[in-house]
Structures are given as structure tokens and as C-alpha cells.
UniProtKB/Swiss-Prot annotation:
This is Large ribosomal subunit protein uL24. One of two assembly initiator proteins, it binds directly to the 5'-end of the 23S rRNA, where it nucleates assembly of the 50S subunit. Keywords: Ribonucleoprotein, Ribosomal protein, RNA-binding, rRNA-binding. Part of the 50S ribosomal subunit. It comes from Cupriavidus pinatubonensis (strain JMP 134 / LMG 1197). Pfam families: KOW, ribosomal_L24. SMART domains: KOW.
Length: 102
């Protein structure tokens, strides 16, 4: 079970974007793509088959999953634990003990 999933609100703990918040767009193995964080400029070629124009495009680059943490209700970063409730495994915030919505 992944502790961080698509759609989770996270905060960046380290790096040039430290302190920024965003929503997880994708989980790629041990990396996550966070909306508006770690944005790089990529040069795109025009493709007439797809109808795309060329130019410089902003692209969200993935961060390592250990460099982000879920945000609790108080707006603080929190680690995530796994707990069994009613025979199901649920994610629990370590700071508040609240269950994270699936």
C-alpha cells in the first residue's frame, strides 16, 4: 500500500521548492509529480500529425517520494502510518492520528 497517492495534498520538505504545497498528479514508483512544484522548461518540437506547435513548454518533473509529506488539518507536514480497521488497511497521519481519506 502506497502511503502517498494521487490526489493527496502534500508539502515539499527539501530542495529548491521546500515549503511549497500542491496536489499529487501522479505516483511513479518511488517518485511523485506534484502540481506546480519542480517545474522545468522543456523544448518541444512541432508535430503536424498531432497538431501541436513547437516551443518552450513548462513540464512538472517528479520528486522523490521521501522529499514530500502529507499535510494534516493544521497545515503541518505529517508522516503516514498504516493501521488495520474493520479488516481493512487504512492510512493514518502520525501527527493527529486522523484517518486519511482513500
Amino acid at each position: 500500500m502506497n502511503k502517498i497517492r494521487k490526489g493527496d495534498e502534500v508539502i515539499v520538505l527539501t530542495g529548491k521548492d521546500k515549503g511549497k504545497r500542491g496536489t499529487v498528479q501522479a505516483v511513479l514508483g518511488d517518485k511523485v509529480a506534484v502540481e506546480g512544484v519542480n517545474v522545468a522548461k522543456k523544448h518541444a518540437r512541432p508535430n503536424p500529425m498531432l497538431g501541436t506547435t513547437g516551443g518552450v513548454v513548462d513540464k512538472v518533473m517528479p520528486l522523490h517520494i521521501s522529499n514530500v509529506a502529507l499535510v494534516d488539518a493544521n497545515g503541518k507536514p505529517s508522516r503516514v502510518g498504516i493501521k488495520v480497521e474493520d479488516g481493512k488497511r487504512v492510512r493514518v497521519l502520525k501527527t493527529t492520528g486522523a484517518v486519511v481519506a482513500a
